[in-house]
UniProtKB/Swiss-Prot annotation:
Keywords: Hydrolase, Multifunctional enzyme, Purine biosynthesis, Transferase. This is Bifunctional purine biosynthesis protein PurH. It comes from the Bacteria. The keyword RNA-binding does not apply. It comes from Sinorhizobium medicae (strain WSM419). InterPro entries: AICAR_Tfase_dup_dom_sf, Cytidine_deaminase-like, MGS-like_dom, MGS-like_dom_sf, PurH-like. Gene3D superfamilies: 3.40.140.20, Methylglyoxal synthase-like domain. The gene is purH. Its EC number is 2.1.2.3, 3.5.4.10. GO terms for cellular component: cytosol. PANTHER family: BIFUNCTIONAL PURINE BIOSYNTHESIS PROTEIN ATIC, BIFUNCTIONAL PURINE BIOSYNTHESIS PROTEIN PURH. Pfam families: AICARFT_IMPCHas (PF01808), MGS (PF02142).
Amino acid sequence: MAVASKKIPAPDEVRIKTALLSVSDKSGIVELARHLNDRGVRLVSTGGTHKALADAGLPVSDVSELTGFPEIMDGRVKTLHPGVHGGLLAIRDDAEHAGAMSAHGITAIDLAVINLYPFEEVRAKGGDYPTTVENIDIGGPAMIRASAKNHAYVTVVTDPADYPLLLEEIAGGTTRYAFRQKMAAKAYARTAAYDAAISNWFAEVLDTPMPRHRVIGGVLKEEMRYGENPHQKAGFYVTGDKRPGVATAALLQGKQLSYNNINDTDAAFELVAEFLPEKAPACAIIKHANPCGVATAPSLAEAYRRALACDSTSAFGGIIALNQELDAATAEEIVKLFTEVIIAPSVSDEAKAIIARKPNLRLLATGGLPDPRTPGLTAKTVAGGLLVQTRDDGMIEDIELKVVTKRTPTAQELEDMKFAFKVAKHVKSNAVVYAKGGQTAGIGAGQMSRVDSARIAAIKAEEAAKALGLAEPLTRGSAVASEAFLPFADGLLSAIAAGATAVIQPGGSMRDEEVIAAADEHNVAMVFTGMRHFRH
């Protein structure tokens, strides 16, 4: 049953007389406290915060002066007391509440400056179980929620970045209701995200990827000019996951990334991470979250040139992802064509100077590559719900391939098959990818019919051959990958017509035998992976 409200109007302005300060992140707290003290505000604090303020020479009362009870159990119990929560929750204009405060000697707290134990940071750094549990804050969230609930009378500040706003607000000694309400909303968002991080950590510990309640929390990193289209609003929220990528990257030059830039850059970097840098340099060029070209080569510059050769028209205004440090030679190649974003693990000083010639080109350094095998979750909103699944961490290297045709693929065909299947994993379904010699020869993406994807990829390959002045398209003698099974022989026959000599696909169609027979008829080698890579 809902709790009834006393419906007492909230005052617009509340004078700040007593402030409770209890922070884990102590940045700016001494300066804030000094300003409050100069305004005649009584300072009350706890533990390490009390010590920091006292060491700075500020007059500060220990919270035990409000509670009449010392901190116990290594500080686990210090603010969970009516002397604190009564001071935060009391409705000042209610006679009954005022009487209770007077009877029990409870001091009204007008300002609560609180931030929490660094649970998210400890978790991200891989803290052991006892340490992580010890960094679950109890008293902090309780005080924040109490203060936020009673924002009619109490101002709560949870983010050091808001200290300047607070000082500006209380220049006259009071806070307005609108400000208190805004800070309360931010406070509840903070405790919600904090609890979400704890809940999700327990789900990981207990190996429960789909718990009964799934909470997804994030912190606004930047508000964007617009979303996918100019009439849509957008923001970029970060979860605290340290997986190298666009969320953790340093922007070395260029203007703010757009919504589409972030989406495409993430897709590009996840794709190029499939190729181990110690084996060979790799480059992926992305447009609308689909690859235009992907290649490996002895040098990074050559990998870029080979990736570009697959579809230089579509690559215009695209995203370039590299699996090794961006060097000067590669940078010189990239600046020849209009590019939106470059993302790489690192960037040499020489490359930075070259890219600086294009000041609008966004340059990101991540400090590392994401591990495709690392477990994780992806989420997608639908009307009235949220679709959550584990990340597609399937790797071709971990699959035992099954040769289903009379002819076994050659060693080179097998390498081309694996390369093509890696790329197909990152192409929107229906996906068909031709590859030859560590280079995509043609990519067909996002078609409702798989045979159309095969045809489009072949057409792209023919166009690329003409642009490069080649006698024949690179699909001649190539391997072709399909991210899902070939439902009919028509897709296979289209690939054969384009010149493919080897096919890799998951298998599992009701017409597998028909498709295998068509491959045998044309002396084409085919392997089944048993793993599908749908991407929508």
